[in-house]
């Protein structure tokens, strides 16, 4: 079997090799790792990389989906099938406090909804199962606070991120040593761009949620975003009437807090062509990123992904 030398690897092959190295490093050095699964395109790439990294064995860690109960229906439909097909054990956690209080983005706003369902839900799940390392699909090109976060991001005993108290990462040398009670958030695709992700999905034929492709969907224009009416829980404001538009999503989250973009890109080559021409970040469609100045960094300091 021939092996490509590093000098002959393509750009995507180099990224793939780096990500697989990170996955194996954590599996070897940490006692109880887990892979966070948000059902989005970045998670799909991470699952595929993990399956490759440990083939023909099953990946030596489970998947964890922190469920808010407000994801798009198409995301839930894909979740169980993909995890089963790739041989992962899937754990689903819902914050019992948020569930009991009926926390939702309409009555309680995006900030409280995100804090209880996502941040507190994640911290509960990590503590419940005793995970000491969690893989996440964040990338540096997404948002400024993620741009300065290390690949191996250390969290305190309270699961908080202190950007001023992180380990240096020299070349490809990663330090996994933790103080008692500390944990790691690890980002294997930190150095990938949105375009890299799409090209890799196309090259490897990775299954993704159909919402990433343009189709006629019912949306309302709200606060500068096109919000899809995904089920009968959606509350229309006075004067709002859903309109059918050709839209797709560049990022996926809770559907009342995720804006679509008008598009006709219905295939992977068309999406890639669109990415070559775009000048905006994919996270412009996330309502939670616009709560307040530097809100993503504050969320991460409180324990967010």
From Swiss-Prot:
NCBIfam families: CysD, PRK05253.1, PRK12563.1. Residues 283-305 are annotated as: Disordered. SUPFAM superfamilies: Adenine nucleotide alpha hydrolases-like. It is an enzyme of class 2 (transferase). The gene is cysD. It comes from the Bacteria. GO terms for molecular function: ATP binding; sulfate adenylyltransferase (ATP) activity. One of its GO terms (biological process) is sulfate assimilation. HAMAP family: Sulf_adenylyltr_sub2. Keywords: ATP-binding, Nucleotide-binding, Nucleotidyltransferase, Transferase. With CysN forms the ATP sulfurylase (ATPS) that catalyzes the adenylation of sulfate producing adenosine 5'-phosphosulfate (APS) and diphosphate, the first enzymatic step in sulfur assimilation pathway. APS synthesis involves the formation of a high-energy phosphoric-sulfuric acid anhydride bond driven by GTP hydrolysis by CysN coupled to ATP hydrolysis by CysD. Pfam families: PAPS_reduct. Its EC number is 2.7.7.4. Heterodimer composed of CysD, the smaller subunit, and CysN. It catalyses: sulfate + ATP + H(+) = adenosine 5'-phosphosulfate + diphosphate. It comes from Caulobacter sp. (strain K31). The keyword Signal does not apply. This is Sulfate adenylyltransferase subunit 2. InterPro entries: PAPS_reduct_dom, Rossmann-like_a/b/a_fold, SO4_adenylTrfase_ssu, Sulfate_adenylyltrnsfr_sub2. Belongs to the PAPS reductase family. CysD subfamily.
């Amino acid at each position: 079997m021939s092996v490509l030398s590093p000098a002959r690897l393509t750009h995507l092959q180099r990224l793939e090799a780096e990500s697989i190295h990170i996955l194996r490093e954590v599996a070897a050095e940490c006692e109880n790792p887990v892979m966070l699964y948000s059902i989005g395109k970045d998670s799909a790439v991470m699952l595929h990389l993990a399956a490759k990294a440990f083939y023909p064995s099953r990946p030596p860690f489970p998947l964890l989906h922190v469920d808010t109960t407000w994801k798009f229906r198409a995301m839930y439909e894909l979740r169980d099938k993909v995890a089963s097909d790739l041989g992962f054990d899937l754990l689903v956690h819902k914050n019992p406090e948020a569930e009991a209080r009926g926390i939702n983005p309409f009555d309680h706003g995006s900030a409280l909804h995100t804090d209880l369902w996502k941040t507190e839900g994640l911290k509960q799940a990590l503590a419940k199962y005793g995970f000491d390392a969690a893989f996440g699909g964040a990338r540096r090109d997404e948002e400024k606070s993620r741009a300065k976060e290390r690949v191996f991001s250390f969290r305190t005993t309270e699961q908080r991120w202190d950007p001023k108290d992180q380990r240096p990462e020299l070349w490809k040398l990663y330090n996994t040593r933790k103080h008692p009670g500390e944990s790691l958030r690890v980002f294997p695709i930190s150095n990938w761009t949105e375009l890299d992700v799409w090209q890799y999905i196309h090259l490897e034929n990775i299954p993704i949620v159909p919402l990433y492709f343009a189709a006629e969907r019912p949306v309302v224009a709200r606060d500068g975003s096109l919000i899809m009416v995904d089920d009968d829980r959606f509350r229309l404001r006075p004067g709002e009437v859903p309109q059918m538009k050709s839209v797709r999503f560049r990022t996926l989250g809770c559907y009342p807090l995720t804006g679509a973009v008008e598009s006709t890109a219905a295939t992977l080559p068309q999406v890639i062509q669109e990415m070559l021409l775009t000048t905006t970040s994919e996270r412009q469609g996330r309502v939670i990123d616009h709560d307040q100045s530097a809100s993503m960094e504050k969320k991460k300091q409180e324990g967010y992904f």
